[in-house]
Amino acid sequence: MGSKKKKWILSIVAVIILISVVSALYVYSKLESVKKVPISKDDKELKIDKKAEPYGDDVINIAFFGLDRRKKEEPSRSDAVMILSLDKKHKKVKLSSIMRDSYVDIEGHGKTKLNHAYAYGGPELAIKTINSNFKLNIRDFVAVDFYGLENIIDTVGGVEIPVRSDEIKYINSYMQGTAKVENKVIQEVQNPGLQNLNGMQAVAYARIRYTSGGDYERTERQRTVLTAIMNKIKKLGPTEFPKVVSSLLPNVESSLSSTEIMKMGTSAFALGMDNVEQQRFPLDNYCEGKLIDGIYYLLFNEEKTINQMHKYIFEDIKPN
């Protein structure tokens, strides 16, 4: 190989390395724009159950909350409650939804709906509630409100969603309400089928609860949208990625530090984002809706649900 060719190859490699380093530094600097919300680091305070505590680091569970609010500072119920599980042993990424109407015990407030925990005491109480009622080991969270989610989706260029004919009228109806608040013009969804939805359309899709599947299908739609965002981010090129990161992160709140977010993101992509496994809890046949004092709650078989959730999240991993 001639010296000129060697120099040319070395120059190309040097440029690639430089771009990679600059991109990494840029992304890291933008991580500081995430709103850091400190929560307790004490396992006892977070109600980490002894049944889940010994699993070690084979599976990392992070709570994800989709918040129903219009102003950053106002108290909000968690319209979506999910657990993102990074399973290092089986090299899987799993996304679990917990029904928001689940009838659970919330510290200081007695038995009520799961999604009230965030409004009563923010992310820390919400994490405590999940851990204590489902015997889990969640120590951190990520949260985004629906307006932030809309911005994120628009930044990645929309997401591909399979829209059914019975969902169209609800998508357009939800968008009309959002448009009044945001003073925007809506772009109505016209036809069913797989299509690229913009931020407002995709968020409206995720909020539908009046089709035949009710709230059960709603949780599935929420997971579909979140998974579509993950897949879209993974496919971004090196020139697009910094732009997306700079726009995405200011919409996010988290207990994780910038270093931890980088580490978690790297782990998630390394484990594979193309086929995120999904599940919803409680499972069918182990729960029933019931009116208590005129309010709808979802009652569930606690022992069975805990066992099913652990089997799904931890699989064959045994406590240390």
Regions found by a protein language model. Name each.
Residues 46-51, 64-70, 77-82, 116-131, ...:
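N-terminal post-signal-peptidase region of extra-cytosolic proteins
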Residues 154-237, 319:
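Flexible, polar/acidic helix-loop-strand segments at domain edges
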Residues 69-73, 112-120, 135-140, 192, ...:
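Second-shell loop/turn segments in exported
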